């Protein structure tokens, strides 16, 4: 019995050693020099309005003051088609034209699930449609949007849906993978530019999203608030977590590019951040945390990052006389 017990312990030790060695090896990957990193932002006119800002004024400042030349823009379906077959392209046309005049590169996000709360942005007229009809209308909106903009040379990729495999987050229907595949296939049939599929960095496994992507985009957050736990959370992970995850997923999926599509650069609290005190906002984002986040992201082994929070930086600047993050961003995008 004694010898048998020793053999079991030895096998346990060997197994653990192999697992730990594999994790250690998978945690290695290329880390890019700071001068080779590329930064962009996600812009939401909806979020700017929510903060009481003029979206057009802000957008021009993003282009001309911050010198941002990589953008993720959002084709909100409920704004583009507020009534069935009644389209309003004015806002998105303007954004794309302004970006084009500065030769900025654009990822255009399309779908029912898109950036910013409540995550899904279906027009109200689709609420009472049967699912089959709603799907048909969704495909029609994607088709019309891509056909409208596919001759624009500044659009470099189409993002189809936003974090589709995180359907439990936000006010959204359950994911239908087969329909997601139809959306992606439609986009591919209309234009040859790459397809971006995104997923949560901390809450998803990536494989299903990465398999569908030419460009896979992860989110990256460190400090958030959980309504379920009713407390603030600091994710106890290191940059190596993303290196390991990427290397493991790369065994099963082979996107051509891996990017950080949503890098936390704004607070995440129990309420909208404009309704939080400065001290409360600082718990999850401020200038020092932004600098830490940028260092963390670089060490995670990615080269391209789209920051999430440009509306917040400007709101802090004009509403609270706090221009620290805005000025930090100037230096970031100027490099």
What are these regions (language model features)?
Residues 76-91, 114-135, 164-172, 230, ...:
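Surface-exposed, active-site-proximal loop segments in enzymatic domains
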Residues 1-20:
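N-terminal Sec-pathway targeting helices
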Residues 189-273, 324-328:
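Glycoside hydrolase catalytic-domain groove-lining segments
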Residues 49-65, 138-148, 199-209, 286-296:
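Short, acidic/polar
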Residues 57-126, 170-197, 211:
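Aromatic-lined substrate-binding rim segments of carbohydrate-active enzymes
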Residues 113-115, 138-173, 306:
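Active-site groove signature of glycoside hydrolases
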Residues 22-69, 74:
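Boundary/entry segment of secreted carbohydrate-active catalytic domains
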Residues 156, 257-335:
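Substrate-binding cleft of secreted/luminal carbohydrate-active enzymes
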């Amino acid at each position: 019995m004694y010898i048998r017990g020793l053999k079991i312990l030895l096998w346990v030790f060997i197994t653990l050693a192999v697992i730990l060695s594999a994790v250690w090896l998978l945690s290695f990957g290329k880390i890019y020099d700071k001068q080779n990193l590329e930064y962009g932002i996600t812009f939401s006119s909806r979020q700017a309005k929510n903060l009481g800002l003029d979206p057009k004024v802000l957008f021009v400042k993003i282009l001309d003051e911050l010198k941002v030349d990589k953008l993720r823009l959002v084709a909100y379906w409920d704004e583009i088609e507020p009534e069935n077959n009644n389209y309003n392209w004015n806002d998105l046309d303007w954004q794309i034209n302004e970006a084009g005049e500065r030769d900025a590169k654009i990822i255009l996000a399309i779908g029912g699930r898109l950036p910013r709360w409540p995550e899904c942005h279906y027009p109200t007229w689709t609420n009472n449609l049967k699912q089959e009809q709603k799907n048909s209308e969704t495909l029609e909106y994607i088709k019309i949007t891509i056909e409208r903009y596919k001759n624009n040379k500044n659009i470099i990729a189409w993002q189809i849906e936003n974090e589709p495999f995180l359907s439990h987050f936000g006010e959204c229907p359950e994911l239908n993978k087969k329909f997601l595949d139809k959306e992606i296939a439609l986009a591919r049939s209309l234009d040859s530019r790459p397809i971006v599929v995104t997923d949560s960095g901390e809450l998803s496994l990536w494989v299903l999203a990465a398999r569908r992507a030419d460009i896979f985009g992860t989110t990256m957050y460190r400090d958030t608030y959980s309504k379920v736990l009713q407390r603030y959370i600091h994710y106890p992970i290191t940059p190596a977590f993303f290196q390991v995850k990427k290397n493991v997923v790369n065994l099963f999926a082979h996107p051509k590019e891996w990017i950080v599509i949503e890098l936390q650069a704004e607070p995440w609290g129990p309420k909208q951040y404009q309704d939080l005190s400065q001290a409360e906002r600082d718990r999850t984002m401020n200038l020092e945390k932004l600098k830490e986040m940028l260092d963390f992201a670089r060490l995670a082994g990615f080269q391209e990052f789209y920051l999430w929070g440009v509306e917040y930086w400007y709101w802090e600047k004009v509403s609270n006389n706090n221009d620290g993050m805005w000025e930090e961003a100037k230096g970031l995008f100027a490099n």
